[in-house]
From Swiss-Prot:
The gene is comK. It comes from Bacillus subtilis (strain 168). GO terms for biological process: establishment of competence for transformation. Disruption phenotype: Transformation deficient. Loss of expression of at least 165 genes. Signal peptide: none annotated. This is Competence transcription factor.
Length: 192
């Protein structure tokens, strides 16, 4: 993994190569350390700002994605979020997103994780690199499983495995009557 030594970037959007967005203090200011498959670099934005910007880049906002997670899973504390549904980019926070120490991990890039001697978690990423994160093993495991559940629920919806709810469709009374009449005729025609 190469280390970029250039000046920090001013902005960034999470993408398929993003492994983690972690807080890093630079000159007394919280910035972000971006870990991608092949490189590490810094951005002059807080991790949550990058996550929100990335959600907006893909047509929503952090608040919108957080609300979407709640609608699907009822997870409200440290919810994982879907940044980009078309590219299967799901992130989960290491702590409460309101805390400046909160980092974000890309679910798809987590290959293995284990507890360390001091109750942190050592994570092996898809690029083969390992990193120790200041999060307990149980908390990290919980975040991984909750994100997997969110991914599965969204994928089921995308694959149409969840029945569509017809009550959201509003039709004028005449059309409803005709639809019911047509349905009855079809059912009777199939039976007789």
């Amino acid at each position: 993994m190469s280390q970029k030594t250039d000046a920090p970037l001013e902005s960034y959007e999470v993408n398929g190569a993003t492994i983690a967005v972690l807080p890093e203090e630079i000159d007394g200011k919280i910035c972000s350390k971006i870990i991608e498959k092949d490189c590490v670099f810094y951005v002059n934005m807080k991790p949550l700002q990058i996550v929100d910007r990335s959600c907006r880049f893909f047509g929503s906002s952090y608040a919108g994605r957080k609300a979407g997670t709640y609608e699907v899973t009822k997870i409200s504390h440290k919810p994982p979020i879907m940044v980009d549904p078309s590219n299967q980019i799901f992130l989960f926070p290491t702590l409460s997103s309101t805390r400046p120490q909160c980092g974000w991990i890309s679910h798809v890039h987590v290959k293995e994780f284990k507890a360390t001697e001091f109750d942190d978690t050592e994570v092996t990423f898809s690029n083969g690199k390992t990193m120790e994160l200041p999060i307990s093993y149980n908390s990290f495991e919980n975040q991984v499983y909750r994100t997997a559940w969110l991914r599965t629920k969204f994928q089921d919806r995308i694959d149409h495995r969840v029945p569509k709810r017809q009550e959201f469709m509003l039709y004028p009374k005449e059309e409803r009557t005709k639809m019911i009449y047509d349905f009855i005729l079809r059912e009777l025609g199939e039976r007789y």
